[in-house]
Amino acid sequence: MRVATYASHSALQILKGAKDEGFETVAFGPSRVKPLYTKYFPVADHFIEGAYPEEELLEFEAVVVPTGSFVAHLGVELVEKMKVPYYGNKAVLRWESDRSLERKWLEKAKLRLPRIYEDPDDIDGPVIVKPFGAGGGRGYFLASSPEDFWKKAERLGVRSKEDLSRVQIQEYVVGVPVYPHYFYSKLNGELELMSVDRRYESNADAIGRIPAREQIDLGISTDYTVVGNIPIVLRESLLMDVIEAGERVVKAAEELMGGLWGPFCLEGVFTPDMEFVVFEISARIVAGTNPFVHGSPYTWLRYDFPVSTGRRIAMELKQGLEEDRLGELLT
C-alpha cells in the first residue's frame, strides 16, 4: 500500500507524515509542481502528472488522502465515483459542499451558528456573502444593506434573486477568527484536538494599514482570499468549548451520514463574550495544519514525538493495516 495525495494544499505535510510512518508516497498533479515534491522538498517517492491518474494509482495500490484542492479540482461527483480507495467517508462530501445540508448538520450538533438571510432585502445589519464551494475565501465580501449587497454581488454574477443559489448570506459575527483542527480516530473511537490557526487573508489583513479616508477615496473593497496561516494557542479555559463542539459534530455525523473520521476543522470566531460561533466545517485536512509539520503544543501534550495531522493520518492507516481493519477507514 502507498499513500497518495494531490500535489497542492497540504500535500507536503501528508506525504512527510506518511514517510515518517514508513509508507511509500505518491503525489499527482500538474508537471510544474513536480520539483516541489521531489527536489526542493523530497517527500514524494513517485510523481504522476494528471488531476486524477486513476489507472496509475490503482497499479500503485494507493490510498488517496483527500484535501480541499483535490475535491475542488475534481468535483464531488467524480470523487464519489473514483475507484481508488479513499481515506474517509465520501458521504460527508455532499454534506460539506451543500451549505443547506452543512447547516442541518451543524444545527443537529447544537452549535451556535450565524443567522442566514434567504432574501437580501431582509439584510438589517452587517453580513458576509460567500460563494458556494471551497475557494479559500475567494469572492467573499461584506455588505451592510440590501443596496450594498446588490452593488457588490454583481462582480460574482449575481444580478437577480434567481442567481442567489450561487451564494450564502451570513450574519457577520464580530469576534476573533479561530480554526481548531481535529482528528477523530475511527479505530480508537477518540477525538483529538490537533492544533489551531487563523488565516492570513488578502486584503483583509492588509487593509488596516491604509487610513480610512484613503480607503474611501481609493474605493478599496475588502477581500478574504487566504494566502497563509498563523498558529494560535487558545486560552486554556476555552479548550473545552472547542473540544465539546468537535465531539457533537462527530456524533451528529454518525446519525446523519454514517460517520466522520479522520481530520476536520470547525471554522468560527470567539466573540467578546467568549462564545464560540461556528460558520463552517471542513470535513478533511485543512491548510491551517501546515504550520505544525513538527507537531503542535496540543499534540506534544498527547504524544512524546512530533505528530502533524498528516502523520496522524498515516498512523491511523498503519494501525488499520496492523489490526487488519484498513477496510473500515476507506470508501
UniProtKB/Swiss-Prot annotation:
It catalyses: 5-amino-1-(5-phospho-beta-D-ribosyl)imidazole-4-carboxamide + formate + ATP = 5-formamido-1-(5-phospho-D-ribosyl)imidazole-4-carboxamide + ADP + phosphate. The keyword Magnesium applies. Binds 1 Mg(2+) or Mn(2+) ion per subunit. The keyword Magnesium applies. Residues 76-322 form the ATP-grasp domain. Keywords: ATP-binding, Ligase, Magnesium, Manganese, Metal-binding, Nucleotide-binding, Purine biosynthesis. 5-amino-1-(5-phospho-beta-D-ribosyl)imidazole-4-carboxamide binds at residues 9, 69, 229. Belongs to the phosphohexose mutase family. It comes from Thermococcus kodakarensis (strain ATCC BAA-918 / JCM 12380 / KOD1). This is 5-formaminoimidazole-4-carboxamide-1-(beta)-D-ribofuranosyl 5'-monophosphate synthetase. Mg(2+) binds at residues 267, 280. Its EC number is 6.3.4.23. Catalyzes the ATP- and formate-dependent formylation of 5-aminoimidazole-4-carboxamide-1-beta-d-ribofuranosyl 5'-monophosphate (AICAR) to 5-formaminoimidazole-4-carboxamide-1-beta-d-ribofuranosyl 5'-monophosphate (FAICAR) in the absence of folates.
